[in-house]
């Protein structure tokens, strides 16, 4: 018999015993009572009473009602020490036969298992080791767990099980709970920041007839009632800019985007983005906003501007570096013989790319080739917080051209730890230029570029009504959560990440 078969046999045996206990509870009446009301959380009690002197605490006679899942139990004859866990943390219970009604200790407490959810009433005291504990006087089993906790709750270490059965991961791993608390604080902090700046939160369509706002491959579905193919949105950008045309001059949205592309430690097909748009601002203003926001989040969540990520350390209290895409490519590609002139001539750029082993697509112009060279030689060097600026117009179809050099745009990407965290630019509000760029994207798509943008003629019509000078940015919430929680994979910060079916 294999080790796995032995484990399954043991599991089936333990579940059988637990089901028998549940049957006995059903025979007594309501096996799943729901009238218990707690008046305290574990961590709140620790915060308030951990520093209290034991004798003074005993004299106060503080009575509490708590509930949670049984994580450990240690029987000592006529008494049992139990640790329960609620949403805030853990607390110890002292359950003694003499403190409970007759028969309760033997008949009820004796049949509790790890993983069961209980509610208790009792008074606070300190043990000989000075641990805050509840001396229980009333107990109630609220939910019988039919399956045991993983590995007798010594931890859930199988990474795939952690992702597929996140509920077990959250029960078993304090670090996972901390990660998702941090993620929640990131989202709440972002919302608070933009509302305080006078932005209005809005919601735009998830199902779109034309998927616009980014270069990506969309998911396709079909609307039966309308008998039309639709797409899960890849970005909300074009709808948000329509709202600016309509007079909502500061808008933001925190919501999901979907891209039918690869899965990796940095990519999940369903992910959360912040997008915001500010009229009468440019991309420099947005870079300033971003620095301020990330600094505030670090202080509010971590209590410091220092953010540690793996072996790296970032100081969000310092100004972020700002460098153009071309300058970064020359700076970090110098050891590979790249010079500035290689990036401003199509033939030289193509030859440089091919020398680096880059497969140049037929649909690529100079801008796409230069971007590919940057990604090959420079991107992974952008470790400390860096705003990469002045992207080629060819790869920035929605961004405003730079006044001094129309071949590049007033655009930036934020890189931290060698990863793109955000993307923003001064918006293109020239309707005729936008129409021409959409046509160029259509030509690229017809030439085989699956990620080229669709043409949105209604958006062009909106621009023809007049978009004020505007700047907009998208920030990846998942990647920000990875940073603040020091999580190595995007799956660690998404509660239920996409997984291949077994």
UniProtKB/Swiss-Prot annotation:
Q: How does it assemble?
A: Homodimer.
This protein's source sits in the domain of life called Bacteria
Cofactor: binding comment: Binds 3 Mg(2+) ions per subunit.
Q: What family does the entry list? A: Belongs to the class-II aminoacyl-tRNA synthetase family.
Instruction: Provide the top EC class.
Output: ligase
Keywords from the named record: Aminoacyl-tRNA synthetase, ATP-binding, Cytoplasm, Ligase, Magnesium, Metal-binding, Nucleotide-binding, Protein biosynthesis
GO MF term list: ATP binding; lysine-tRNA ligase activity; magnesium ion binding; tRNA binding
Among the record's GO biological process terms, what is one? lysyl-tRNA aminoacylation
Q: Which Pfam families match?
A: tRNA-synt_2, tRNA_anti-codon
Classification from the root reads: Bacteria, Pseudomonadati, Pseudomonadota, Gammaproteobacteria, Pasteurellales
- Write down the chemical reaction(s) this protein catalyses: tRNA(Lys) + L-lysine + ATP = L-lysyl-tRNA(Lys) + AMP + diphosphate
Residues that bind Mg(2+) 2, according to the entry? 420
Its main localization is cytoplasm
Name the species this protein comes from: Haemophilus influenzae (strain PittEE)
Name any cofactors this protein relies on: Mg(2+)
Q: What is its EC number?
A: 6.1.1.6
Provide GO CC annotations from the record.
cytosol
Where in the cell? Cytoplasm
Query: What's the protein name?
Result: Lysine--tRNA ligase
**Entry's InterPro entries?**
Aa-tRNA-synt_II, aa-tRNA-synth_II, aa-tRNA-synth_II/BPL/LPL, Lys-tRNA-ligase_II, Lys-tRNA-ligase_II_bac/euk, Lys-tRNA-ligase_II_N, Lys-tRNA-synth_II_C, NA-bd_OB-fold
In this chain, Mg(2+) 1 is annotated as bound at: 413, 420
Question: Which residue positions does the secretion signal occupy?
Answer: none
């Amino acid at each position: 018999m294999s080790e796995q078969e032995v484990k399954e046999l043991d599991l089936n045996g333990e579940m059988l015993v637990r089901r028998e206990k549940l049957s006995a509870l059903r025979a007594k009446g309501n096996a799943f009572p729901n009238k218990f009301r707690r008046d305290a959380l574990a961590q709140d009690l620790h915060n308030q009473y951990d520093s209290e002197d034991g004798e003074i605490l005993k004299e106060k006679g503080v009575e509490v009602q708590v509930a949670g899942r049984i994580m450990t139990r240690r029987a000592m004859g006529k008494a049992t020490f139990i640790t329960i866990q609620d949403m805030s943390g853990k607390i110890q219970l002292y359950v003694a036969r003499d403190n409970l009604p007759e028969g309760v200790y033997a008949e009820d407490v004796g049949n509790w298992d790890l993983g069961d959810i209980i509610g208790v009433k009792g008074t606070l005291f300190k043990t000989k080791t000075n641990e805050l504990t509840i001396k229980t006087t009333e107990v109630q089993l609220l939910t019988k767990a039919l399956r045991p906790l993983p590995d007798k709750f010594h931890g859930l270490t199988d990474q795939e099980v952690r992702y597929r059965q996140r509920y077990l991961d959250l029960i078993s791993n304090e670090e996972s709970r901390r990660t998702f608390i941090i993620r929640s604080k990131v989202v709440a902090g972002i919302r608070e920041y933009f509302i305080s700046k006078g932005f209005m939160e809005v919601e735009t369509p998830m199902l779109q007839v034309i998927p616009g706002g980014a270069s990506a491959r969309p998911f396709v579905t079909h609307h039966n009632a309308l008998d039309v193919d639709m797409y899960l949105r890849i970005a909300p950008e074009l709808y948000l800019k329509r709202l600016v045309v309509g007079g909502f001059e500061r808008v933001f949205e925190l919501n999901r985007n979907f891209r039918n592309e690869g899965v990796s430690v940095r990519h999940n097909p369903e992910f959360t983005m912040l997008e915001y748009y500010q009229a009468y601002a440019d991309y420099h203003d947005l870079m300033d906003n971003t620095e301020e926001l990330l600094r505030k989040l670090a202080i509010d969540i971590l209590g410091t501007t220092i953010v540690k990520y793996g072996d790296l350390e970032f100081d969000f209290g310092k100004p972020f570096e700002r460098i153009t895409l071309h300058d970064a490519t020359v700076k970090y590609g110098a050891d590979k013989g790249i010079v500035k002139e290689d990036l401003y001539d199509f033939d030289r750029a193509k030859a440089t790319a091919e020398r680096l082993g880059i497969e140049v697509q037929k649909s690529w112009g100079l801008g796409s080739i230069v971007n590919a060279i940057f990604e090959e030689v420079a991107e992974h060097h952008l470790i400390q917080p860096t705003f990469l600026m002045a992207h080629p117009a060819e790869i920035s179809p929605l961004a405003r051209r730079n006044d001094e050099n129309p071949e590049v745009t007033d655009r930036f990407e934020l890189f931290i730890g060698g990863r793109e965290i955000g993307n923003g630019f001064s918006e293109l509000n020239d309707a005729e230029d936008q129409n021409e760029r959409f046509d160029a994207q259509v030509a690229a798509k017809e030439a085989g570029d699956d990620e080229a943008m669709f043409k949105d003629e209604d958006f062009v019509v909106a621009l023809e009504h007049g978009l004020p000078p505007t700047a907009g940015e998208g920030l990846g919430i998942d990647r920000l959560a990875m940073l603040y929680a020091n999580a190595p994979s995007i799956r660690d910060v998404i509660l239920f990440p996409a997984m291949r079916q077994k």
